[in-house]
């Protein structure tokens, strides 16, 4: 009999992927063999917020996923220090430099770095709650349709299966993935090459958003420059979401949408035609 697997998610701040990462292994709430709990610090991700995650250790997770923007920032760094004695996977939009990622691996952490999870235009002059939610909805369209959700789901399932089979602690093989657009789109299961090309374009656009929004968030001072630049970044994200939708519509029109639901026992099933059963 396989072990019940406790999977903990620590959400510090917010990425696009933060919205669903704790749901993607049990999409219809019918999977047996796993229990999921989430500790969130809201929009903030300071060292003081990281310190509060210590109490989550009482739940005794078999492995933990820490998701946050910029894993090299002080808050996420403090969280890693707290959780270094538990198998831990870092999910973040950075650092993107190879040396920094290798340092995570040397310290025993798994990681999935997502340069395609875009930086929001987080300036009071531009961003309110409605704009924030709209941007995240656009980001989720790209992350879901274009392969990012499935990539992460597959990697978390691999670690879950190891725990269920009796592995634990340092014996677990954790992912070490830099998820560039070309890698992500290969997980989306597109049958039509034009659909795949639209999805790849959407991922490249999502990656570009951070390059546009970074100056608006951290460098520009004049209100016109800040607002124009942040608005441009959000327009790129909206256009990327439209391309992602177009890609899925092509697959739907050909009845070739790739679906990979979980069986009750956690096995991943597959189907393509709308009216066929997943097997």
UniProtKB/Swiss-Prot annotation:
Record keyword Oxidoreductase present: yes
Catalytically driven reaction(s): 5,10-methylenetetrahydromethanopterin + oxidized coenzyme F420-(gamma-L-Glu)(n) + 2 H(+) = 5,10-methenyl-5,6,7,8-tetrahydromethanopterin + reduced coenzyme F420-(gamma-L-Glu)(n)
Keyword terms: Methanogenesis, One-carbon metabolism, Oxidoreductase
Molecular function per GO: ferredoxin hydrogenase activity; methylenetetrahydromethanopterin dehydrogenase activity
Organism domain of life: Archaea
EC number(s) reported in the record: 1.5.98.1
Gene3D superfamilies recorded: 6.10.140.120, F420-dependent methylenetetrahydromethanopterin dehydrogenase (MTD) (3.40.50.10830)
Pathway where it operates: One-carbon metabolism; methanogenesis from CO(2); 5,10-methylene-5,6,7,8-tetrahydromethanopterin from 5,10-methenyl-5,6,7,8-tetrahydromethanopterin (coenzyme F420 route): step 1/1
Gene Ontology biological process terms in this record: methanogenesis, from carbon dioxide; one-carbon metabolic process
UniProt similarity note: Belongs to the MTD family.
Function description: Catalyzes the reversible reduction of methenyl-H(4)MPT(+) to methylene-H(4)MPT.
The name this protein goes by in its record: F420-dependent methylenetetrahydromethanopterin dehydrogenase
